[in-house]
């Protein structure tokens, strides 16, 4: 009965806001700039490295450090972002990520030695990690139910779009052998600055506000997101759904037959321990919430303390879903797509693309444009991914995509083995002394 009632409320809300899609889409696109920055950083370093290794005389080991340092920093930024977004809000964390990325792009653009370049990559990596954790959550929590699936996938589309734009930027500035790499790396600060300015006026996640007992602010946020057609009763229904979803997590946990120390300690928490002293304004909010069947500020705080990773691992349903989701993400990274994207220009160069061209600028331009083509193929297929996922079974799509990746990696590995075994290097033209060659020819003719 309750499920049917919620379904009817969902349909009512969805019909009301079906014409108010502009604001959610705009907010999602501005949020997905975080994904765009991740994709841009992934793609831009491929072409920039062609100039960086010559400008700074980089060894292969140092090139790998420059590429991987941002990923290491992102791995640090992700868990930090998860904690911060729960305590200070999704919006603030996204703003912080924009500031970090903007600073990192500026540092890379004005780098004068290898250490400053490495520092810029480190800062950018932190921004990527912070954004990668907070942006998808924010998009999911501000999206209307009937649009949530499509809007969440926009973040992935923006990642691949960032890779395409990075390839085009690389191709445009590759001819500038002195400062081209500065433009490539520094331009990434433009979309991050746009996101920074735009997010100052963006609404906070309504779900986060409800979770923290700020239901009045959640009402205002919903009104801004869904538009004027979203009337008061429907706003209350939406907030009630959020509250029920949060309470479902609590009920699922308490239904588990566990009695460990963590649960006992939480069970002994008195409501007064959750109330912050000096916050007298919360009591009027508590009264309004109780009248509407919503949790008080103190109840929300206690409820929020239960929504931790440890407790997710203790629940069978959430634990299984968490392991499956994290496992799929892990294998997605291990299949090697990042290696191809980060080193696509290097791979094409090693394969001999443009190797017979004595014009170095023309050779590099050809390599970078082909690298952009690889990124465009990735972007093109990501556009069709939402339709494919909604049309075919998820497991079938996963099997087909993994099979394609496996075959592609096999072809790539075999190709490099054949090039190494049966071909001469064609991407490097050895310099020769024309005068010495002439002397040798003259000497040979004289002896004859």
Where do the protein language model's features map onto the residues?
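Transmembrane-helix signature of 12-pass secondary carriers
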Residues: 2-223, 251-448
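Short amphipathic alpha-helical segments embedded in low-complexity Lys/Glu-rich regions
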Residues: 68, 235-243
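Short intracellular "coupling" helices and adjacent cytoplasmic loop segments at the cytosolic face
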Residues: 225-235, 249
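Generic hydrophobic, helix-prone segments enriched in Leu/Val/Ile
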Residues: 230-231, 242, 337
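Flexible, disordered linker segments and immediate boundary regions flanking tandem C2H2 zinc-finger modules
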Residues: 233-237, 424-426
């Amino acid at each position: 009965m309750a499920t049917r009632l919620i379904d009817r409320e969902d349909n009512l809300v969805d019909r009301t806001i079906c014409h108010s899609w502009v604001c959610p889409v705009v907010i999602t696109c501005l949020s997905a700039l975080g994904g765009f920055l991740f994709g841009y950083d992934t793609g831009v370093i491929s072409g920039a490295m062609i100039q960086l290794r010559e400008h700074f005389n980089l060894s292969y080991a140092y090139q790998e450090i420059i590429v991987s340092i941002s990923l290491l920093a992102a791995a640090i930024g992700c868990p930090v972002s998860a904690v911060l977004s729960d305590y200070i809000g999704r919006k603030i964390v996204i703003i912080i990520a924009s500031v970090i990325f903007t600073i990192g792009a500026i540092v890379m653009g004005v780098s004068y030695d290898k250490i400053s370049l490495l520092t810029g990559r480190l800062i950018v990596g932190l921004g990527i990690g912070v954004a990668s954790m907070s942006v998808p959550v924010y998009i999911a929590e501000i999206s209307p139910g009937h649009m949530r699936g499509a809007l969440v996938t926009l973040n992935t589309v923006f990642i691949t779009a960032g890779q395409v734009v990075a390839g085009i930027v690389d191709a445009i500035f590759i001819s500038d052998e002195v400062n081209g790499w500065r433009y490539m790396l520094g331009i990434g600060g433009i979309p991050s600055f746009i996101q920074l300015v735009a997010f100052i006026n963006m609404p906070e996640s309504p779900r986060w506000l409800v979770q923290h007992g700020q239901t009045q602010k959640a009402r205002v946020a919903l009104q801004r997101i869904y538009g004027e057609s979203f009337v008061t009763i429907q706003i209350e229904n939406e907030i009630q759904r959020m509250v029920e979803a949060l309470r479902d997590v609590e009920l699922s946990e308490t239904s588990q037959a566990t009695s460990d120390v963590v649960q006992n300690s939480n069970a002994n928490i008195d409501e007064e321990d959750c109330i912050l002293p000096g916050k007298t304004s919360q009591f009027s909010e508590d009264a309004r919430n109780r009248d509407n069947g919503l949790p008080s500020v103190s109840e929300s705080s206690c409820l929020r303390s239960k929504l931790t990773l440890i407790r997710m691992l203790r629940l069978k349903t959430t634990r299984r879903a968490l392991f499956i989701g994290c496992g799929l993400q892990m294998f997605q990274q291990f299949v090697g797509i990042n290696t191809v994207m980060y080193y696509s220009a290097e791979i094409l160069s090693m394969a001999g693309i443009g190797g017979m061209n004595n014009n170095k600028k023309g050779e590099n331009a050809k390599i970078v444009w082909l690298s952009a083509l690889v990124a465009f193929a990735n972007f093109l297929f990501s556009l069709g991914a939402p339709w494919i996922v909604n049309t075919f079974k998820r497991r079938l799509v996963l099997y087909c995509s993994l099979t394609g990746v496996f075959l592609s990696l096999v072809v790539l590995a075999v190709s490099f083995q054949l090039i190494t075994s049966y071909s001469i290097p064609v991407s490097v033209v050895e310099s020769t002394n024309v005068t010495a060659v002439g002397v040798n020819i003259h000497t040979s003719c004289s002896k004859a």
